[in-house]
Amino acid sequence: MLSRAVLALVVLLPFSPNPAGEYSKHFGALSKLSIAVAEAMPPDQYGFRPHTESMNFGELIAHIATTNYQFCAGLKDSGPPSLPSPIDKDADVKFLSDSFEYCSAVIPNLTEEQLNKTHNSPDGNLLGREVLLALYIHVAHHRGQAEIYLRDKGIKAAVL
């Protein structure tokens, strides 16, 4: 009986889920919600800042995009690609969308070794799993800020 169990494991092992599957399965929703928030703000309000010490809305969206690239490049142990300097809503939304696409090409392909290895990130040297957690927290934190900017302008935040 034990040999059947071992045989079953040998046969099924190649079909086991990707080690990063637990992270990548939620990344689509994170991306869609964030892009929807960026798209919800009217172009003429991208310079809005709720407080003089706050980033304006466009800067906040660009900040999310920039750090997405930095976190995901760190997981590849490389520097981020050259990044644009968006000047309007369309450029900011594209920058954000492209950053999520970049990460979407990295995250599902991470190996168990990469998840357990230390990588450089905007939050310092972290294990790959911690880099992913920091990425998700960072996006959620700043997307939440962006939703407050929308509320200040009387705009309903996006919901999936």
Roles of regions detected by a PLM:
Residues 24-28, 32-35, 45-82, 120-160:
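Short, contiguous alpha-helical
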Residues 41-42:
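Membrane-proximal, proline-rich intrinsically disordered regions
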Residues 16-24:
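Short, low-complexity N-terminal intrinsically disordered segments enriched in polar/charged residues
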Residues 37, 87-120, 126-140:
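Acidic/histidine-rich alpha-helical segments that form the ligand environment
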